Amino acid sequence: MNQLWRASCLQVLITFLLIHQNKASEKDRFVELVDCIADSFTVVLNKSDPEVMRMISNPKSQPVVYVYGHKTRHPCGTSMKDEKGLTNFNLTIPYGSECDVTLTDLPKHRYAETTVVLEDNADLSFGKTTRLNHVFCLYTRNVKTIRFSDVSNGHEVIASTGGKPKPKVEMLFRSTDSGKTLQAARENEFVEFFIALSPDSAYHGISPKECTFSDREDISAPDAKKITFVQGGCPVNGMNDIIDPLANVNDQIYFSKFRTFRFGNQSTVFVHCQVQVCLKKDECSKTCYKKVSDSNLTAERLRFRHKRSITDLERRTTRSAPTDDNGSLDLTNSLTVVSRIESAELVASPISQPTIVDTPSEQRRDPCPKSSNMGFIPLIIMGSLASLLLFSAGAAIYFGCKLKSMKKKDSFDMMSAFSNPTVSMPVTYSHYQRSAYNASVDSLYR
């Protein structure tokens, strides 16, 4: 009973110490994140850290952050405040002997680490606070990808407080005629094959290490059939009847062309590739791959064409499964190879009509009738409008001419009236023009 009690007390004590240690480590950490690029990494300080906030707000403080042991070297340290009051929370540490930060090669990764120091230069007391924070970067060396159409990253799950950039590697198949991305192809037809890296600030080159055709999603199955066309980082000789040797564009894109085939009667073919990812292009450069220097092919153009070509295609569901204890995932997709007989049957078979299920009358909607003469209706309307326009113009011309002739007939010519002696001009007087003088004058003519 006493032993059980002692064990319980010891377990509670260990749990308390672990919790206290984790809280202390979180409290002591003043680095928010680490941004890893190819030739250096940038340490970003936590702006909400109480000590950092206190030194920034104190006008007399002079906070600095630097690589441990290299305070006097300019590239290895920086001041967080300048004379103008501007603040800086970033420290970029280059790789090399200058700051004694080097990349260490591991079987699956590259590793760089150091320790940064945060202190106040204005504090000259003996017991001033100096804080240390361990930082590191972890770079993936190999990427296992089996997928045709999407970006596949290294999925290794490693507990860390540093940075771990993920390379973007894409594998896809395209038609040799239209250049569209393929999910199915006919047997014995040529298909283009691409492996492309989208270069970023960390990764600038790739190199295929091993690529295999297989009839199984799980390539490690005992009865899986395999055809390896890249092995040991170079194309396998004697595979020209199936696939051409991979060619290299700028150490970032590898492409080839192969003739589709089937494993027996199985129409699904899987492609497995393991790719080495490099921080510099020359690290992945190999002479066994044919280099194409005059090509304008880039990963961005490949991705643009791929996205444009798959908009009308049904996206296949991604299947993933863990492959090792580190938790890395292999993404799987398949290429359907249709035989000549199956292709002929698909062409000859009638198009199946969808079955119409009877629905209640209030929910059933009859489709709008489509007449075969729907295309002639606009022509008929246009002809009628043109005829009406011509008729209106003719009527307007006819009535205009007739009105003009009537005006000429009823008009009065003053010169012809005075020159013709037989014409009598009656003179009328208004009521207001009749006067005594006018009456006497009028009587003379009667």
Swiss-Prot record:
UniProt tissue specificity: In the embryo, expressed in the excretory cell and, during dendrite formation, in the non-neuronal cells surrounding the sensory neurons, including hypodermal cells.
Residue stretches making up the ZP domain: 35-295
Bilayer topology: Single-pass membrane protein
Signal peptide: 1-24
Subcellular location: Cell membrane; Cell projection, Dendrite; Secreted
UniProt keyword list: Cell membrane, Cell projection, Disulfide bond, Membrane, Neurogenesis, Secreted, Signal, Transmembrane, Transmembrane helix
Cystines in this chain: C211-C273
GO CC annotation terms, alphabetical: dendrite membrane; extracellular region
TM spans (from-to): 377-397
Record note on what altering E217K does: In ns88; results in defective neurite extension
SMART domains linked to this entry: ZP
Top-level taxon of the source organism: Eukaryota
InterPro entries attached to this UniProt entry: Celegans_DevNeuronal_Protein, ZP-C, ZP-C_dom, ZP_dom
Main subcellular location of this protein, as a coarse class: membrane
Pfam family, one: Zona_pellucida
Outcome of swapping P107S: In ns117; results in defective neurite extension. The dendrite extension defect is suppressed in a wsp-1 gm324 mutant background
Effect noted on mutating G394D: In ns118; results in defective neurite extension
Record-level GO BP terms: amphid sensory organ dendrite retrograde extension; anatomical structure morphogenesis; neuron projection extension
Reported effect, V52E: In ns120; results in defective neurite extension
PTM description: Proteolytically cleaved and secreted in vitro.
Keyword Transmembrane helix carried by entry: yes
Oligomeric and partner information: Monomer under reducing conditions. Homodimer under non-reducing conditions. May also form higher order oligomers.
Function comment: Required for permeability of amphid and phasmid neurons to external dyes, chemotaxis to ammonium chloride, avoidance of high osmotic stimuli, male mating and dauer formation. Along with dex-1, enables neurite growth and maintenance by anchoring amphid dendritic tips during neuron cell body migration in embryonic and larval development.
Name used for this protein in its record: Protein dyf-7
